[in-house]
């Protein structure tokens, strides 16, 4: 993270009358938490704020209760103010139907921590060393001189605790930031449970079926191993995006595999693929080869074909 870029973003957001904040498609806690934290801070400074995400899927119920959610507007209701900020979107494509709102802005900015993000705004605050976008938003709020109260801190904590896997792969700076957010009033026990440890019973039935069909390919990744599971479209029926996405965090625990993959059938012959690695394999170029992106140890992409074909496509890339 460069303090100068955070300061530059803060200057751009000072004394502006209105701002549109865009979150990425299939929103998670980092993009929504970052968007709402920034939105609340700007609103308190007299700025007209709207926060939106491409509503191809509903907002997860765990995120709907975050402070500041009244700032959220439906994608079709977005005004599109002259100043637009994208939070946690690794590429313009991740804004999906709202990409045109971003490109039409008089002044556009991105705040993001994905290594695959090469920058697509007029001003880009991108730091792949940051554990989540929320910590970058915090740096901007500090430059703005915003008081971090319990509401803003809660939204930032949501992004931090989820993107670090409940701090399992957090950097030392993230623990210091977490302590600061807790001091500001975050109810860590409640929000950690809501965001990470809460599932409907039908999720257990889906997981049982998926894990029963998991496959290990020990020779993949030059002998480091791949474990993968397939979530058929019938199993996704009635499941939220976040519930299906959580499967990969179970699959990745297999000791015998460096890389884990979960193939989710979102439609006829269409798939989203979630990838995780433990230490040695950089997933960014693998995902990028399929038009996706993400982080070194957590990436994803979309593919088309039969289940056997999309698995074969991945194996060819490893």
Mark where each language-model region is.
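Conserved beta-strand scaffold positions in the cores of enzyme catalytic domains, especially
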Residues: 108-110, 124-125, 226-228, 262
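Short, hinge-like loop/turn segments at secondary-structure boundaries
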Residues: 67-71, 126-129, 278-279
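Glycine-rich, phosphate-binding/catalytic loops in enzymes
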Residues: 38-39, 101-104, 126-127, 177-178
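Active-site cofactor/cluster-binding pocket
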Residues: 64-67, 72-122
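Hydrophobic helix-and-loop "lid/oligomerization" segment in the mid-to-C-terminal part
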Residues: 2-25, 33-61, 80-81, 157, ...
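An acidic intrinsically disordered interaction segment
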Residues: 1-8, 100-108, 129-131, 135-137
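Short alpha-helices
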Residues: 111-179
